Amino acid sequence: MKINLSNYTWEEVKDLADLDPVILLPLGAFEQHGKHLPLKVDEFMVNKIAIESVNKSHDKNIKAVVAPVIWTGYSPHHMDFAGTISIKDETLTNLIIDIVESLVKNKLERILILNGHGGNIAILKNVGQKLKYDKNIYIATSSYWDFAMKEINDWRKSELGGINHACEMETALMLHMEENIVKKNKIEDNPLKRSPYTGVDLLSGGAVGVSASFKELSPHGVIGSPSLAT
């Protein structure tokens, strides 16, 4: 079984549907990640993780295929930094619904949307509700880090506030996936320090949500401690 749906012909997709595979749909973003990481981080990493996950599933005789990555997402909070490309929440909602409906029409119905950007999470929850109640289509959604929270906590070196954006975790993943593109000499730390009632870290969701642009929180686009990444 081929890993990427894009490598199938239409005849092969008809045969693929008979196998009832899991379709992994990666969802990323195209936005600033500090001075040391490229704009592609979210869409690049989630796509790599999806491909590797499907590859490992094949080793266990689990039928799964990766759909083409949705490379941009909801990132208005990063628009003060050059290069960010954001789409409206309703645009992203409709785009995902259209893609899911297309897959379902092709009898590819076991769909997991794998997210790689925090700004997409609320939209994904809404998409799942709309598909269920408006279209009677069931999907699963998750962010890749949700599968590894314990492991992230075990290997992290930073204190609370060190894993957020362009942080220890994302920098470590990019060092593993494409080290030559990381500008190590440009790394700057900026651990978030604010009320404990608001979330300051991937592993510490706060009780209170407060919207803010990244420019208000960081002069260079980093929230966290990327210098500790290995």
Predicted regions and their residues:
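Extended, histidine- and acidic-residue-enriched regions that form the cofactor-binding/catalytic faces
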Residues: 1-110, 118-230
